């Protein structure tokens, strides 16, 4: 189970926010403070991790709409990448799995673009970065962990 999520440049959240998830998590706030945006983020993440789509994100997942255009997801609508982080903690094995991604938007094509993603495992004794991909161009990513370029279509 994912125990924490963090996000930056998402909807009305310019600064990095971290939410610790428990079996029951309650969001309280004034109108237009971002409660619905946070809830929609959960379906956005679920859709992305589920691998059901060709895009990094889909604006509609399980009949929940996150916006009309992909730039609706970005704080200020353009010029920034959404940064998302997910942490899964295993208290028995005393380790954390950490996934971080950054997604920008091609406004002309109305498509999300995966800029970077990394995955690491952290335990009491060390931190092992398993993947750290950075986008070089439209079809090429570089993994900083093994110094290898990967071509994608």
Feature roles, as predicted:
Residues 1-153:
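P-loop NTPase switch/coupling surface
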């Amino acid at each position: 189970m994912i125990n924490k999520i963090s996000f930056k440049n998402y909807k009305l959240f310019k600064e990095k926010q971290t939410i610790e998830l428990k079996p029951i998590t309650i969001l309280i706030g004034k109108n237009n403070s971002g409660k619905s945006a946070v809830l929609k983020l959960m379906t956005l993440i679920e859709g992305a991790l589920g691998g059901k789509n060709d895009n990094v994100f889909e604006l509609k997942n399980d009949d929940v709409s996150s916006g009309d255009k992909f730039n609706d997801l970005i704080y200020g609508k353009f010029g920034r990448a959404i940064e998302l982080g997910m942490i899964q903690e295993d208290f028995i094995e005393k380790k954390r799995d950490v996934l971080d991604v950054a997604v920008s938007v091609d406004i002309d094509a109305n498509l999300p673009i995966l800029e970077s993603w990394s995955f690491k495992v952290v335990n009491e004794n060390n931190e092992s970065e398993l993947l750290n991909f950075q986008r070089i161009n439209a079809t090429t990513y570089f993994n900083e962990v093994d110094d290898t370029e990967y071509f994608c279509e």
